[in-house]
Amino acid sequence: MSLRTPKRSRTSDEQEQEQEQEQVQNPDTHVNNEHQQRPGPTTLLSTPVRLKNGFGTPSPPSPPGITKSITKSRRRPSTTSLQGIFMSPVNKRRVGITAHGRVYDHNDDGHESESEDDENEEENENQKKYDGHVSMPLLPPTTPKSRRSEVFLSPSPRLRSPPTAARRSTGERPIREISHTLRTRLNYALVKLQNGWTDKTLPELETELAPAVQTPPRRYHNRFPDSADAGTSAHTAFLQALGGHPPREEATAVETLMLLSSPTKKQQHRPVPATSAGEPTDETEPESDTEVETS
């Protein structure tokens, strides 16, 4: 039974020695390897481009034997070199562009078909955009209190429409007078509708209603109470003045009413005022007439 010794893991010194030997044997592949390890103009998220004559055109693929040696001799870049690459402003901008969804066109071999000139033009355009960007001033936040105050503010004259501004004149009556006249006209129309005067005009109504409005003048007799009267107050004197009428006028009014009610007896009563004052008049006759009429 044979014991096999475990294989030792190769140290970094042994790997470096092997790489030096391969470089001596294949100097052409070493040159291509350096070109691959050099950070090109492409982004870190995309595949590397093989440089030829200083341009970004892809070179034809190498034979399979050479590619194997290249993969063996490929070294992992140190952290310091990665920090230098990521911290450069150009790479920062490139990483930002790729984060926004920039997609490169690839050819059949899987390499990028974008040249250095196109990348330089895009970098210049992006730089112009960043330089020409003007920061907008921040607006103050809108609060309920500010919104309420804006509602009550009147608009400036510039915001008014031209016909509205031209229609308003200095000699125009204010709105309250217009509303007062409109209210008066509405009240007048309501009174006409309630009394059935819709077909009549204002002059016709004035001529018809003028006699009804006028009241006949009343006679005022300023009769002071005598010393013999019991009531000497001013209130009783005022009541007597209002209620006192001359008896002769009252009798005359009754007589005219009787004459108008019985026109046949008007002739019988005509000679009564023609008699002399000394002759006695028959006062019982009209009473009998009134009794006959009532029966």
From Swiss-Prot:
Additional facts recorded: Present with 1440 molecules/cell in log phase SD medium.
Modifications the protein undergoes after translation, according to the UniProt entry: Phosphorylation by the cyclin-dependent kinase (CDK) CDC28 controls both subcellular location and association of WHI5 with SBF.
Role this protein plays: Transcriptional repressor that negatively regulates G1-specific, SBF- and MBF-dependent transcription. Binds via SBF to promoters of G1-specific genes to repress transcription in early G1. During G1, phosphorylated by cyclin-CDK CLN3-CDC28 and progressively hyperphosphorylated by CDK associated with other G1-cyclins, which leads to dissociation of WHI5 from SBF, activating SBF-dependent transcription in late G1. Elimination of CDK activity at the end of mitosis by the mitotic exit network (MEN) allows WHI5 to reassociate with SBF to again repress G1/S transcription.
InterPro entries found in the cross-reference section: Srl3/Whi5, TF_Nrm1/Whi5
Species classification: Eukaryota, Fungi, Dikarya, Ascomycota, Saccharomycotina
UniProt modified residues of type Phosphothreonine: 47, 57, 290
Protein name in the entry: G1-specific transcriptional repressor WHI5
Compartment annotation: Cytoplasm; Nucleus
Modified sites of kind Phosphoserine: 59, 62, 88, 113, 115, 154, 156, 161, 262, 288
One GO MF term: transcription corepressor activity
A Gene Ontology term for the protein's cellular component: nucleus
Compositional bias ranges of the Acidic residues kind: 114-124, 280-295
UniProt KW keywords: Cell cycle, Cytoplasm, Nucleus, Phosphoprotein, Repressor, Transcription, Transcription regulation
Protein induction: By transcription factor HCM1 during S phase.
Biased composition (Basic and acidic residues): 102-113
Broad class of the protein's primary localization: cytoplasm
Known partners and oligomeric status: Interacts with the heterodimeric transcription factors SBF (SWI4-SWI6 cell-cycle box binding factor) and MBF (MluI cell-cycle box binding factor), each composed of the transcriptional coactivator SWI6 and a sequence-specific DNA-binding protein SWI4 or MBP1, respectively.
